[in-house]
Curated annotation (Swiss-Prot):
GO terms for biological process: homoserine metabolic process; methionine biosynthetic process. It comes from Rhodopseudomonas palustris (strain ATCC BAA-98 / CGA009). Keywords: Acyltransferase, Amino-acid biosynthesis, Cytoplasm, Methionine biosynthesis, Transferase. The gene is metXA. It is found in: Cytoplasm. The lineage of its organism: Bacteria, Pseudomonadati, Pseudomonadota, Alphaproteobacteria, Hyphomicrobiales. InterPro entries: AB_hydrolase_1 (IPR000073), AB_hydrolase_fold (IPR029058), HAT_MetX-like (IPR008220). Residues 64-374 form the AB hydrolase-1 domain. This is Homoserine O-acetyltransferase. GO terms for cellular component: cytoplasm.
Amino acid sequence: MMNIHSVKGQKIAAGERTQEVDHPHSLVAQFGADQPLPLDCGIELSPFQIAYQTYGTLNADKSNAILVCHALTMDQHIANVHPITGKPGGWLTLVGPGKPIDTDRYFVICSNVIGGCMGSTGPASINPATGKAWGLDFPVITIPDMVRAQAMLIDRFGIDKLFCVVGGSMGGMQVLQWSVAFPERVFSALAIACATRHSAQNIAFHELGRQAVMADPDWQHGRYFEHGCFPHRGLAVARMAAHITYLSDAALHRKFGRKMQDRELPTFSFDADFQVESYLRYQGSSFVERFDANSYLYLTRAMDYFDIAADHDGVLAAAFRGTQTRFCVVSFTSDWLFPTSESRAIVHALNAGGARVSFAEIVTDKGHDAFLLDEPEFIDIARAFLQSAGTARGLGKAEH
């Protein structure tokens, strides 16, 4: 499924151009019994592995590294053709030569999160104790667990301090967690369309999706691999419901309205008469070809558990007190999944903690997914922030 190369403890040399944007291949960093991953649930995961992509060149002093943290249903293939779908990378609007995250200037790393299903250890991986897929025996993971695993990967490169950590949605949660857990290792942080904790509404939407998966008879209590089946129907419904939250009423009206799908009159049946119905069915059916159902359960649960203030006596500002990281927080006016009020709460906490922070609210009708789309104002803001941070960091052009 992927061209994966094992990297057992070896470090990447500065100046080595590990991947070209046009023809990259995934790498896997393996961590043995001597390098367990401590999890918030109280156990250690060992052995485990992290699949990742890199783009660009790590400079001599390793000061130009950007970690991109992917969103819930994305993976490490942000700027290359996806090995399963054959589609372009998931964040080409932001990552690539001449883009805001300029791969001619920066060394870019993106790893599949722990619990994911594109090469990193997750519930679809083989449990070494049983020789079968982990299924629900896989430990429940959290956003902090994901970040600890990423930090172990960054150590493999010998990178002490990341120039920037960037991410949107679940990726933005990881950005914030990086800045709290490893403030001395993050020079700048770009947190997009996210929050410091999941709202009751978002937890409710996630529970709807999880119940759709678990209600599918083919889910088999998470043991579907052993039964030779897959809960396609349940996962497709979960994706359809979630995808609605990524859009906006205005965007749906502009794109579909009440237009019919390949017909002029209703069929008076339960076929997909409307274009929006056909679109959602496509989103569901295509998603199940590239995503594991149990991973969906685990990653949505990780987002639900996320709450930075909970570890600081309920005082969010305390989490950021004394940080030297430069922050940029971005929200979108039509994002009702992570509304601007959530971003303002982040900014207020950063200000109270004495952090350097800039904030932008982008006026758009594209909804939550605006951060993945061609949104010129957002792209300009990301570029300006990274250029300013790069000047402060003393970065020139990447060495080739």
